[in-house]
Structure formats: structure tokens, C-alpha cells
Amino acid sequence: LSYHQTRHAKTYVTGLAAGSSKTVTGIAREVLPAGSDRALNKFITEYDWDEDELNHERLEELQNHGETRWSTDGYIVIDDSVLQRTGKELPGAGSFYDHSEGEPVWGQDLVYAFYTDHKTSYPLAFRQFEKDECEDQKEAEKTKYDLARELITELEEEVGVPAATYLFDSWFAHDSGLIAHVKSYGKDWVGSLRSNRQVEYANKERRVDALEERIDTEEREIDDETYNTWTKTLPVSKFRQCTASDSRERTRR
């Protein structure tokens, strides 16, 4: 990067981290009050960026510091999030169901991978989900499951994240292809199983939430909390079922 390009890069990163407005105009106004947003906008939109290469260099830099260095004891979280927006012309913007709001919202839907361990947490990579005007994500060119598998391939084959375990919620755990993809790299996974899923137990199909009264649990202390746990491998698309409840609320996990 040239001197001016480096200055623009520092301006943009500083604005994203500390500015109240994340737009180019807002960043130029707050970080460089005497500067014009035209030069910064040109740097962002017209410079020939390789976003993947830049992100990989960011991750490499994080490994040079003990407090952010990843390890096999860490976890990779796969999830998605809807970022609410107002602009109608933003790339991939549309109406997506937001679980935190409990209703559809206008925004951009990102499927992302996140690294976390006992000392640090930071994003690894992301893919933007676009519905292509389809009401059902199954009709889209790429589903969220497809994007999640792409992320896993990138992290395992290009980045080389050593974390031994992937974590995801019941929605992603519902896709047996995603589970198989994780296992193909010799990695473990932990995911929630929906309580209405049918599993075979004692030669009979039962709902997961009906198992609790038929199993013997074992108490375990985790972070000063007492959980009643039980594990067993069941024939439900090769899921490994783990039922846990705390001693007060009996909440299944």
C-alpha cells in the first residue's frame, strides 16, 4: 500500500472500531474532520481488494500474540445472524426472519464462523446468504447449509484452524450433511437436538423430550452449576444425543 492508501486503511479501521457512524461519510467526518469522504470512498470501492487474502492475513497476525493464538482446545461456532438495515439497494438485503425479534426484518443475513476459547474470541470468516427473491431458502442458489460447509472447508483446508470441536444450534445440527462434513476432517461437534425429534430408544420411536422420564441421569458440576446428564448414541442420522438439566429448572440442553 502507498502512504495515502495506508492512511485511508487506518482511517477506515479506526472509524469502524471507535466511530459512532460506520458509513464512509460518518467515518471521514469523525476521524478526519478536515478530510473529504470522496478519497476514502474511492479507496474502499475502487481499490482492487482480495478480501479472503486480507482476512487470512488478519488471522495469521492474531497467531503472533499469545492472548489471541488459537489451539486445539478452542471451539469453532457456526451460526447466522440478521443485520437490520434500511437501504433497499444493499447487496443481498431482503426480508429475513430474526429469531431475536421473533418476526421478519429487513436486513442482510450472514452465516459466520467464530473462534472462542477460555482466553479469546474473534470472527474467522463469513458468507452472505441471499434468497434471490425465493421465499424458501431451499429454493435459493446456495442454502445456509451450503454456506456453512463452504466455511468449514475454508477453515480446514486454507486457514488451518486447529480447534478440535465445532458448535452449532439445533437449526444447523438438523443438517446431517453438515455433520458429515465436519467429521470428514476428523473434528468433533456439539449441537442441540430439537425436542420434537423422533429417536429410537428401547426398540420404540419416541420424542426426545419424552426420554427424560425413562433414563437415569448422573449429576455433574460445571462452572458451579449442577447438571443431570445422560449420553447415548441413538440411530437418528448418527446423532450423539446428550440430555442435561440443572437441578433447579430441569431445563434440557
Regions found by a protein language model. Name each.
Residues 1-10, 138:
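Basic, short loop/linker segments at the boundary and entry of helix-turn-helix/winged-helix-like folds
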Residues 119-126, 133, 137, 188-253:
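An anionic, glycine-rich sequence signature occurring as long contiguous blocks
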Residues 135-210:
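Domain-level cores of phosphate- or acyl-group-handling catalytic modules
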Residues 46-124, 130-132, 242-248:
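Active-site-proximal, Lys/Arg-enriched surface segment
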Residues 4-5, 16-88, 154, 185, ...:
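Electropositive nucleic-acid engagement tracts
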Residues 11-13, 110:
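Non-membrane alpha-helical segments in proteins
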Residues 38-42, 100-163, 252-253:
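Electropositive, glycine- and tryptophan-enriched low-complexity nucleic-acid-binding patches
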